[in-house]
Amino acid sequence: MKSIVDPSALVIDLGAQKRPTVISVVGAGGKTSLLFWLAELLQASGRRVLITTTTHMFMPTSHWPVVFCRDPAMLPHASLTSPISFCFHSWKANQGKVQGFTPEAIDALVQRPECDVILIEADGSRGMPLKAPDEHEPCIPKSSCCVIAVMGGHTLGAKVSTENVHRWSQFADITGLTPDATLQLSDLVALVRHPQGAFKNVPQGCRRVWFINRFSQCENAIAQSELLQPLQQHDVEAIWLGDIQEHPAIARRFVN
């Protein structure tokens, strides 16, 4: 275990030594903020970063350029050379959201030589801090070399229900919890380890990172021996604990 993590270690966890690097982020609320943080982390090491989605996400408000197109693999060279940029299929003004591309379209985009890193929001959660996937979720490109599953650590010790869990029925099936039950760390571990849980549809050979976000509010609720089960059983390659809105965003990192 290492505290106040060296950013270069996080790059290793992501498998970002190779190019192109395709990272898909799934799970609960906090995915978009994590994507932005990852973009700055990876761009700081000299990589060009493209951010997109296989679902929908709120229209970015950052200063980074945004490109809309039907087929990202056919974009002109200049559209893919910004240090950090966004690329989407369309804009849904009535929802304030952008629509992304199919996983297959992103797999084709990866073949472009301009692409160093593609960051993908590959799941929806309606901003809730916990989420289990439905039958059609998540939408992960086969070219992904790393998948990060996000969960809200501030829910540990709190009551869970449809108010703070997206896809409650699936979540209850995996964890065995009933409405208004108190969430335990073992329930999050079950969500990580279950084949229909947090890492559902992850391509073979893909690195897996479990990120417990907003961890600073629940540090005392973490039993390290229980937390490390997915790592010891090789369900994940790394566990990150932190708060994406704080500095440093990742306060603890566990790897084998």
Swiss-Prot record:
Q: Which SUPFAM superfamilies match?
A: MurD-like peptide ligases, catalytic domain
Give the matching InterPro entries.
Answer: Mur-like_cat_sf, YqeC
Q: Name one Pfam family in it.
A: YqeC
Would you kindly state one Gene Ontology biological process term found in this protein's UniProt entry?
biosynthetic process
GO function term, MF aspect, one: ATP binding
> Superkingdom of this entry's organism?
Bacteria
NCBIfam families associated with the record = selenium cofactor biosynthesis protein YqeC (TIGR03172)
**Protein name as catalogued:** Uncharacterized protein YqeC
Organism lineage string: Bacteria, Pseudomonadati, Pseudomonadota, Gammaproteobacteria, Enterobacterales
| Gene it is expressed from | yqeC
